Amino acid sequence: MNFGKKVWLIGNSSEKSKKTLNKLSKILKAEHFVFDDINPEIVISVGGDGTLLRAMHMYEYQLDRVRFLGVHTGHLGFYTDFTDEDLFEVVEALYDENPAQAIHYPLICVQVSFTDGYQIVRHVLNEATIRRASKTMVGDVRISDYLFERFRGDGLSISTPTGSTAYNKSIGGAVVHPRVKAMQIAEIASLNNVVYRTLGSPMIVAEKDTITVCPAPEDDYSLTFDQLTFEYKNIKSIEFSLDGTTISFANCAHTPFWERVSKSFIGEVE
């Protein structure tokens, strides 16, 4: 018996995902799982990594009591352990799933402070980025209390270890195992010449350190929190930290990290 385990399903708009979600819903209902979108124990994403990220942000303020499981219906699913052909295996895994054995990945806490004193706080699973809405971005970068550099360029990306395989990798960042509790800063098209100078390489920042970016407050900026994009003015500072918040994945046939990396980017090695 599943003892009325509460689940909720979130899918993307593709026809394949819709069909998979409907089929899985029927199987779960037949097995007497309880569907609860307010206080689910397990959120099942059906689609790809973007769907999983959307699901995480929908339950961003319940992460201490929600676990996630991914079913991918496309070509690449870094956060997903099952395919659309594994639906009965999904049900078996949900029966066997033990909350005490959940897999936890760290999230980055992003605190945005504005010149009028207003603040917003978000958490990201992959990365947060800051860019100028137009022209070159200029901003001081502090590591904890130390003024490290004055950055000039298109922008900055700050990623988690699991997010190191996403946008961070595409701009030359390193791939970092989730057991390494750290953040990574990667530059987006920095200016480096005889007048302006940045480090010019990705940086791994330790767990207890904070990263603070102080951009010119009069400019317009585009901030992303994973797949979410917002436009802001009058930003005083943006602080990035590992505050202990994690996302929990149901430990159901969970694929080891390096196996995920190999399958996602390299394929079969002969």
Curated annotation (Swiss-Prot):
Signal sequence region: none
GO BP of this protein: NAD metabolic process; NADP biosynthetic process
Alphabetical list of SUPFAM superfamilies matching this protein: NAD kinase/diacylglycerol kinase-like
E.C. designation(s): 2.7.1.23
Cofactor(s) for this UniProt protein: a divalent metal cation
InterPro entries: ATP-NAD_kinase_N, ATP-NAD_kinase_PpnK-typ_C, NAD/diacylglycerol_kinase_sf, NADK
Active site per UniProt: D49
Subcellular location: Cytoplasm
Keywords: ATP-binding, Cytoplasm, Kinase, NAD, NADP, Nucleotide-binding, Transferase
Pfam families reported for this sequence: NAD_kinase, NAD_kinase_C
Reaction(s) catalysed by this chain's protein: NAD(+) + ATP = ADP + NADP(+) + H(+)
Positions with a binding annotation for NAD(+): 49-50, 54, 126-127, 152, 154, 165-170, 189, 227
Protein family: Belongs to the NAD kinase family.
Function field: Involved in the regulation of the intracellular balance of NAD and NADP, and is a key enzyme in the biosynthesis of NADP. Catalyzes specifically the phosphorylation on 2'-hydroxyl of the adenosine moiety of NAD to yield NADP.
Protein known as: NAD kinase
The species this protein was found in: Lactococcus lactis subsp. cremoris (strain MG1363)
Lineage per the UniProt record: Bacteria, Bacillati, Bacillota, Bacilli, Lactobacillales
Gene behind this protein: nadK
